[in-house]
C-alpha cells in the first residue's frame, strides 16, 4: 500500500537511492591485462587477467554456493585460431571475490590485508595462429556481467 501523497516523493527518493546503491555494489567483471608473446612463427602465448571490480563476490552469497545455484565465471577465446596447444576455447575459472571479502585490519595510520579469496585470475593459452589474426576474449557470469576485449595477434 502506498503512503499518503504528501510523503510519496520522499519515499520514492529513498527507495531509488537504495536501489542505485545496491546496483553499484553488484559484482562487475573486468579484463585488466592482456599480453601476446610470440614463441615461434605461428605459436603465440596469450595471457589475460580477469577481475571482479565490484563489492560483492560473483557468487553473491554463501547461501547460493550451498544451494549450488552459483554459476562460475567463464572465459572464452575465439577468433582466427588454427588450434589450441594449451588451454581450451572456453575455460571455467570459478568464483571471484569482491571487495567485501578482503580481510583488512586497521591500526593507527596503517591498513594491512590478510589472506582472502582471489579478486583476480590470470589465464594462459598457447595457440597456433598467424600474426595479424583477430581474437576476442570474453569473460562472462550471469550475475557479474560480461567483459570483452579484442586483440590482434
What residue spans do the PLM features occupy?
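C-terminal accessory segments enriched in acidic
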Residues: 1-153
